Amino acid sequence: MIFDLIKYNSRTAIIADNGTSLTYAELANRVQDRAQLLQEGVLEFCLCRNDIDSIVHYLACLEAKAPVVLLDAQKDEATIQHLRDIYLPGVTKCHPDLAVCLTTSGTTGSPKLVRLTQRNLLSNAESIVQYLQLDANERPITMLPMYYSFGLSIINSHLLCGATILLTDKTYAQRDFWNFLKENQATSMAGVPYTWEMLKKLRFFRMDLPSVKTMTQAGGKLNADIAREYIQNAKQADRKFIVMYGQTEATARMSYLPWYQAEEKCGSVGVAVPSGRFELVDDQGNVIQESHTDGELIYYGDNVSMGYAECAEDLLKGDENNGRLATGDIAHRDDDGFYYITGRKKRFVKIWGNRCNLDQIEQLVKTLTTPCACIGVDDLVTIFVTIDNIEQDIKQLLITKTGLNSRAFEVRVIDAIPVTESGKIDYATLKSIV
């Protein structure tokens, strides 16, 4: 297995919010006992919560070399059964390099999975330990589900360095979460943009959290103004606010923005993680050498997955990516080698012949109100907000910034912006209500 748990022996590995704690030696024993019940090469399902049993099952699968699909334990039974019918856990034989399968979208309704190896997991965990300078004194609190690649990467990287994981399924909207954080002196917090937007509304900047020394953000682009507020708050509180960028297809992390350059390079996703590298290509596939020129971002590294699976037979496939991932993100590089994501290839629409970046429009609207979300079809962009009497302000801003007529924009007020289980905006649901 990639984690040498016994190496940290009597150190505390996990403190759960039910009061249970395990040393690394105790965790290793539980993992060994569970692993003996599993068959090498035969697919397992792990219905995950942020609890000890889920982590033991996950680690036991790695130990036994039984490939495991990590799924949300709270997902409805019909969806889980649908996936069981497709992938046949307990029966399906898998490729010998396959270790973990994760869903691609933050929802478990789609049968499409990303196929990861132990090498992928280890490479990414080692990179994270290196660039975040993690050690055994860390005490991260779980704010993301472990079936989501970002959440799993936090568990992996901290187990690798002998840290103590504060394990909870409570959310930041619950008082018990904050009590657990304070009582156990959490040293780091992690979230997607929606997390940090909501924490700002909960007056995070006024909270007294002296133990928290690191805050990390990934899973999408955080509004630049909000990012600056967190960067300034971090400086005042002697903390680090670290922006990162990744995809499940790369086992979570591909880049990070060094905390000491966060203010200077605000809006950037930084530089590639230590084990990887980036390049940009144009529409013809030619490598872009110039700075400040948009192209598709390509990532190379040992953390790039083997590919996708959409049926049980796909789990026998070998490595289809060979360490290269076309991210589908449009980006440019500045003169110092820092990368900036400008949008998704699939998040562009044509408005009366003009190419329109929905992600950039969303960021503009966020200067007036958060949360918000934008979707579009040719010749119309629909903006969803949660407050009334702001339609004219939004339209005037977008007319000024884009040069487009007001008829290109529609503003809708809804009760709440739908999000996926991993906290990202659920654009599919928004499209269904248009």
Q: Where are the predicted features?
A:
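Conserved AMP-binding/adenylate-forming core of the ANL superfamily
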Residues: 10-39, 77-80, 116-119
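Conserved pre-ATP/AMP-binding loop-to-beta segment of ANL
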Residues: 7-10, 88-103, 110, 133-139
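Conserved ATP-binding/catalytic segment of the ANL
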Residues: 296-359, 367
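Conserved beta-loop-beta connector loops within the AMP-binding
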Residues: 277-299, 313, 317, 335-336, ...
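Conserved AMP-binding/adenylation subdomain of ANL enzymes
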Residues: 122-139, 149-188, 273-275
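Conserved C-terminal "lid"/linker of ANL adenylate-forming enzymes
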Residues: 349, 382, 397-434
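Conserved AMP-binding A3 loop
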Residues: 23, 99-126
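Gly/Ser/Thr-rich phosphate-binding loop
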Residues: 186-191, 200-264, 277
